[in-house]
Amino acid sequence: MESVLNEIYEDWFFRDNIADSLPMAKYLAPKIKEYLNINSVFDVGCATGHWLSVYEEHGLDVSGLEGTTNSIPHMMVDSSKINIHDLREPYQKNHDVDLVYSIEVAEHIEPEFADNYVDALTRHDAPYILMTAAPPGQGGHGHFNLQYKAYWIDKMQAKGYSIYEELEDKIIEWCKIARETSNAPSEFLRVAVDGDGTGLLAGQVRPVSYTHLRAHETTPH
C-alpha cells in the first residue's frame, strides 16, 4: 500500500508543501503553543514535518505520522520521530501528547478509511485536537474526500470530543490581524489569506478544533 501512496505523493508534492505551508506554521504555531499552554504535539499527516520543526524550535516534544517514505528526504525533524503508516490500515500506537493536529490531511483519506483517520486523531485522548479539511468544490492533488465541517464534527463527537470554538475564532482572528496589519511574512499572507479573506484559515476552510469532554476543566479562557 505504501507504493500506492508513493505514486500519488511524489517528490514534487513535498517540495511544494514546504513552500506553501512553512510560513503559516512559523506564524501560527507559536501562537497556538502559547494560547493552549502545551508541551507536546503529534502531527497526523505531517508531510515533511515542517509544522513539527517550528514547534520543536519553541521547545515542544514532537512526533508525527506520515503515509509515504517519499517524505523522508525532505523531513525537517529527526526521522526517528516520524511513524510511516498508511491509514488504509488502522493506526495502533498511542502518544501521550497535549495537542494532536492535522492540517489539510482529511481530504486525502478515502471515505471508506475516514474512520481510521479519525481514530488516529482521537485514540491518544489528547486534551486538544486541531484540524483543517478541504470542503466540497475545492480542488487539489489527491483530494478524495471533500466534506463539509459537520461531517468531521459528527465523527469527532462520536469519539468523545466537543467543538472548541474559542480556538477556532482565535486562529481566524490571528489571520485577519495578519492580513490587515501585514504582521506576518508575505508568504504567509499569500498562502493563508489569498488576498480576499477566503484562504486556508481565513474563510471558507475554517479550522476545526476540539477539546476532549474529560478535559473541559483545563480549557483556557
Segments (PLM) and residue ranges:
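Short glycine-centered segments of the SAM/dcSAM-binding site in methyltransferase folds
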Residues: 127-128
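A short, hydrophobic C-terminal helix/tail in secreted or cell-surface proteins
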Residues: 215-221
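Conserved N-terminal segment of class I S-adenosyl-L-methionine
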Residues: 1-103, 112-124, 135, 139, ...
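A short His-aromatic
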Residues: 108-109
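Alpha/beta-hydrolase-fold catalytic nucleophile elbow
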Residues: 132
